[in-house]
Amino acid sequence: MRKAFKLHSNFKPSGDQPEAIHQLKEGLKNGLMHQTLLGVTGSGKTFTVANVIADLNRPTMILAPNKTLAAQLYGEMKDFFPENAVEYFVSYYDYYQPEAYVPSSDTFIEKDAAVNEHIEQMRLSATKALLERQDVIVVASVSAIYGLGDPDLYLKMMLHLTKGMIIDQRAILARLSELQYSRNDQVFQRGTFRVRGENIDIFPAESSDFAVRIELFDDEVERLSLFAPLTGHIQKTVPRFTVYPKTHYVTPRARILQSMEEIKIELAQRREQLLANNKLVEEQRLTQRTQFDLEMMNELGYCSGIENYSRYLSGRAAGEPPPTLFDYLPSEGLLVIDESHVTIPQIGGMYKGDRSRKQTLVEYGFRLPSALDNRPMRFEEFESLAPQTIYISATPGPYELGKSAGELIEQVVRPTGLLDPVIEVRPVATQVDDLLSEIRQRVVIDERVLVTTLTKRMAEDLTEYLAEQGERVRYLHSDIDTVERVEIIRDLRLGEFDVLVGINLLREGLDMPEVSLVAILDADKEGFLRSERSLIQTIGRAARNLNGKAILYGDKITVSMKKAIDETERRRKKQESYNKEKGIVPKKLEKKIRDILELGQSYTKGKARKRTTTLEENSTNYTALSPKAIKKKIDELEQKMHDHAQNMEFEKAGQLRDEIQQLTLLLNAPQ
C-alpha cells in the first residue's frame, strides 16, 4: 500500500518510545484487539501514537475525554501531519438545554441550544475526509458515540458535478435545496448559494476557505472553479466537484414520506394505549405535538426535534444502535483512547442518563416511544463496533487492564531525561503556613505552583488567604467554561499569576512545564479525589519541570498514598538508571506558550498560529500611531468586540479586549 501519512518532526523516538512503538505495531499486525500504553506525563505518548499511525498507514480516530484535551491533541497531530487530513469532531453546542419534563412541578423545559458554526463546519469536514480519504486522523470527544446521520443516506444525497455534464440550472437549485442549502444573493456564507446569470456560487458547508462556482452554458456545465469567498479570486479550476449535504441529518424526500406513514401508525397505537389507561391529557398532548411535526416535515422536509424520529428516518428497527461517527470510520480503522481511565467510564455513562430523561417524556405524552431510539450507543454496542484499540493512560483503569490481559506497554523514560517529581509527606497541622513558605521560594525563581484541595469552600478560603498574604493567586472551579479554563492555564504559564488553586486539577491534562510544585492538601483523606489514580495524576502535573516536587500533606500514610508514592518511586528509579546508563543529563522542557494559546481560540484550521501573533505584530504597528489615531482605533475595536459578544463569539471578543487593553496602555504611556 502507498504510504499515505507523512510524519513531520525534528525529533527521533528516544527513551522508551522506540520499544513502545515496536510493541504497539507488532500487536496490531498480529491482530490484537486491545493494547494498553502506560505512559507517564511528559513521555511523548502523542509522538509514539503518531509514529504508529504513520508506519501502519491506517485511518485513525482518537477519543479524548473533553474538548480541551481534544483541542490540544488536534493541534499536536496537525503539527505532526501537516500534509494529511487531521480533523476535529466534538459537540458543536456552545450551550445545550435538552428537552425535559419534571412531573413533580408539572414543568416542561423546551430544548434550547446555541450551535458553534465553526465546530459544525469541522464536524462536516471530518466525515467528508473519512468518506473520501485514507490518510485521516479524527480527534473526537465522547460526542462520537451520539447519533449522526446515516452514512448511506448521506452518500446518496451528495450532488456530483463534472465538467461537460448536461444538467438544467433549475435542477441544480432544486438539488441544493434538498441538501438544505439556502439561497442568499446578498450575504454569501457557509451553507448558502447564490445565482448570478448562468453562474451558481456554492459555499460548501464543510469548507472554511473556499467556495465553488458552476458556470453553465445553456444546460451544460462549462467550467467548475474554486474561489476565495471573500475576494472572489479564482484559486483553480477542477474537472469535478462533489457538494456534500449541509447537515448530517439530511434525508431524501421519499424516505421522509415513508417515515411519516410509519410515524402515523405508531401514533395511532400509542393513542390507543393512553386512552385505555385513561391518560386523556397525555393523549391530547402527544397527538397535537406529533401532528404539528408531521405537518412541518411534509412542508419543509424537517421539523424542530426531528432527531426524535431518527429511527424511522434511518430505517432502523426498534432497539438498533444509532448511526454514529464509528459508521464513517473505514473497517481497517484504528481507535486510540486517550486518558482511557476517564474516557471509558464516560462512554459507559452516557446512555443511562439520556434514557431516564426520555422515558419521562414518553410516559407523559411529550414524545412517541420511538424517541427512545434517538440515543448514544450503549457500552456493549460501542465494544462491538470499536476496531483495534490502543488505550493510553498514566493510570490505566480496571477495564483496560482486563481487556489487555494485564499486559502493559510501559513508556516511563522521558526523551528529555526528566525524572518523576520528588515526593514529601508533611503534617496537616501546619499545611497552610508551610505551603505559603514553599510558594514564596518558587515565586523568587519564577516557577509556578498548583494546589489541590478537597472542597470548594476550602479552595475559596485558601485563595482568599493567599491573596491577603500578597501572593498572585487564581482559583479554578467547575463553573468556569472550557475556553476560560484554557485562558487561566495560559495566564499561569505566562506568569500573570503564580499559584493556581483547584479541587480536581488532574482532569486538565494540559502541559504546564513552568509548574515545579504540586501541593496536595489533606492527602490522607481516602476517597475519589485522594485515590491512588488521582494522586498519581495530580503528582504528574509537576513532572515536566526540572525541579519537580510534590508535597502530600497528611498525618498518616494511607494505602492510596503508599501505592502512589511507591509507583512514583519505581518510575523515578527506572528513569535515573536509564539516564545514568546513557549519560543523559535532564533538560528543561521548552513548550511554546503559543501552543496553549491556540486551544483557547476557535479551532480554525491553519489560522490559529497567525492569530496568536496578532497582538505582538500590532503592538509594533501601533507605536507609530498618533494619540488621536489610537483613540479612533480603540473605539473601532470596542464596537467589534461588542458585536462579537452579542453573537456569542467570546473567544474573538476576548482577543479584541486584550488588544484594546494594550492600546490603552500605549495611549496613557508618557510621550
UniProtKB/Swiss-Prot annotation:
It comes from the Bacteria. Residues 26-183 form the Helicase ATP-binding domain. Its main location: cytoplasm. One of its GO terms (cellular component) is cytoplasm. It is found in: Cytoplasm. Residues 631-666 form the UVR domain. The keyword Zinc-finger does not apply. One of its GO terms (biological process) is SOS response. PROSITE patterns: HELICASE_ATP_BIND_1 (PS51192), HELICASE_CTER (PS51194), UVR (PS50151). Forms a heterotetramer with UvrA during the search for lesions. Interacts with UvrC in an incision complex. The UvrABC repair system catalyzes the recognition and processing of DNA lesions. A damage recognition complex composed of 2 UvrA and 2 UvrB subunits scans DNA for abnormalities. Upon binding of the UvrA(2)B(2) complex to a putative damaged site, the DNA wraps around one UvrB monomer. DNA wrap is dependent on ATP binding by UvrB and probably causes local melting of the DNA helix, facilitating insertion of UvrB beta-hairpin between the DNA strands. Then UvrB probes one DNA strand for the presence of a lesion. Belongs to the UvrB family. This is UvrABC system protein B. It comes from Hamiltonella defensa subsp. Acyrthosiphon pisum (strain 5AT).
